[in-house]
């Protein structure tokens, strides 16, 4: 009984304590206006301060033209071309029919695209029939005046004189002109591609003549005489800073046998300056030279009894250059951005002299040299009679230097994607190609300029597309306004 009374007493005391706590700590009336104002002020301050907080942690990204950048890889660059065909005929001809026929042949002659991914679609064509008593013109009108060219001008055997004469009358502007002298059936057709932007054909009037004219316009003036399978324009060796450094190296394999030197400065001033000036619209070219000693090649040669010389083959070319002994990187100004083309004259040692390159067809190379795309070219030079001269210094003769530079110029043309042939074989006529004193004809320089522009645009589009994808994948990446402004110029 006593335990039950104690429990009841404890419960009563606990209830009394709880009642007292409730009366002392809990409100019995509703909150006042002051409490509501304080709560509202805290909530309002949070709402007003949230934009500032959001702005303080925001990643600034200047708007970029992602759509325009992505479309760069799908757009083709179309250069405008202006063609002109001039027919010098003793009898009147239908210029409209000739114009239509040549247009048809041009469309047939453009089956593949250039580096820009475009075909020959943006061009104009003018056809002029210049006969003794009549002058008919169809298509675009250019600067040629009827009667300016005499039919007798093509009778001269001096093709350079004819070339310069035509330049006076059809050489203005970037108009590619084909002059056709229509003759009788007894004449053998012949054609010449000039050094400037024109060619001339002497042929009888036939159905093949329109094809001949279209071939010159498309395959020569448009494609530069190159064909599929030749060195492609991707190999144009222009650096990121627009410079090409031509490094010429004379390598004495064993100076105990002979010690050759050269007066390169005189050759530079007489032969290389015209080439550098001709290529100046494409790249800023600088020239360097050096003479090295103890520079053996890395490949082996063998004695050929039939040819009476030591020989090496095209299969040996990848191992010919000795990168361990040939210290060819002479330029300190390149800075990793300029492309350096190495041109090497390798003087063989006495124990393998004469050293000659055997081509895949079994014949000896006429130049005794080879090229490596994007690297340069090599010429193997053998001293006369291979007689040891000891360590006394001997200078290469001006004639030898001239021959060497001519081979180097041909190698440079190949490295730039051009052919060094003396003729162009068309479907009906074999055309003679007139060489230029500066190493490159005007129509070849035009093609190089177009391909160089295409190459730069293609590289730029690829780089911008890659950067665009990278920026899209990094949403927290900061993009300043200057980047946005520069990117906005990509579509201009």
Predicted features, each with a name:
Residues 169-465:
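Extended, non-transmembrane interaction/recognition domains
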Residues 2-292, 296-307, 311:
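Long, solvent-exposed N-terminal ectodomains/accessory regions
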Residues 4, 447-492:
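Membrane-proximal extracellular juxtamembrane segment immediately upstream
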């Amino acid at each position: 009984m006593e335990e039950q009374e104690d429990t009841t007493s404890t419960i009563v005391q606990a209830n009394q304590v709880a009642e007292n706590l409730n009366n002392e700590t809990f409100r019995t009336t509703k909150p006042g206006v002051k409490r509501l104002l304080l709560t509202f002020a805290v909530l309002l301050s949070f709402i007003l301060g949230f934009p500032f907080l959001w702005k303080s942690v925001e990643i600034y990204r200047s708007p970029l033209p992602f759509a325009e950048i992505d479309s760069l890889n799908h757009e083709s660059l179309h250069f405008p071309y202006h063609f002109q065909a001039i027919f010098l005929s003793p009898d009147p001809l239908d210029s409209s029919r000739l114009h239509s026929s040549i247009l048809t042949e041009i469309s047939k002659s453009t089956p593949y695209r250039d580096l820009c991914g475009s075909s020959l679609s943006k061009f104009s064509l003018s056809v002029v029939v210049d006969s003794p008593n009549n002058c008919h013109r169809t298509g675009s009108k250019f600067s040629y005046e009827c009667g300016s060219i005499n039919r007798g001008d093509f009778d001269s055997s001096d093709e350079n004189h004819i070339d310069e004469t035509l330049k006076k009358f059809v050489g203005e502007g970037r108009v590619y002109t084909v002059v056709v002298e229509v003759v009788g059936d007894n004449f053998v057709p012949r054609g010449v591609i000039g050094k400037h932007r024109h060619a001339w054909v002497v042929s009888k009037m036939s159905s093949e003549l329109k094809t001949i004219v279209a071939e010159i316009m498309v395959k020569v003036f448009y494609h530069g005489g190159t064909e599929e399978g030749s060195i492609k324009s991707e190999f144009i060796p222009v650096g990121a800073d627009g410079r090409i450094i031509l490094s010429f190296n004379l390598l004495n394999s064993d100076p105990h046998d002979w010690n050759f030197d050269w007066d390169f400065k005189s050759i530079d001033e007489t032969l290389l300056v015209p080439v550098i000036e001709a290529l100046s619209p494409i790249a800023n070219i600088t020239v360097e030279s050096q003479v090295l000693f103890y520079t053996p090649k890395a490949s082996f040669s063998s004695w050929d009894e039939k040819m009476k010389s030591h020989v090496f083959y095209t299969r040996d070319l990848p191992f010919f250059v000795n990168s361990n002994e040939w210290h060819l990187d002479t330029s300190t100004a390149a800075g990793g951005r300029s492309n350096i083309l190495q041109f090497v004259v390798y003087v063989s040692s006495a124990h393998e002299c004469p050293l000659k390159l055997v081509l895949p067809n079994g014949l000896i190379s006429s130049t005794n040299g080879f090229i490596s795309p994007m690297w340069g070219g090599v010429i193997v030079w053998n001293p006369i009679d291979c007689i040891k001269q000891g360590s006394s210094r001997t200078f290469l003769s001006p004639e030898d230097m001239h021959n060497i530079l001519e081979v180097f110029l041909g190698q440079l043309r190949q490295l730039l994607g051009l052919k060094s042939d003396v003729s162009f074989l068309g479907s009906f006529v074999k055309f003679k190609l007139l060489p230029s004193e500066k190493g490159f004809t005007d129509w070849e320089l035009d093609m190089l300029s177009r391909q160089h522009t295409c190459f730069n645009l293609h590289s730029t589009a690829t780089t911008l597309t890659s950067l665009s994808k990278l920026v899209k994948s990094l949403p927290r990446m900061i993009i300043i306004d200057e980047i946005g402004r520069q990117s906005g110029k990509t579509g201009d």
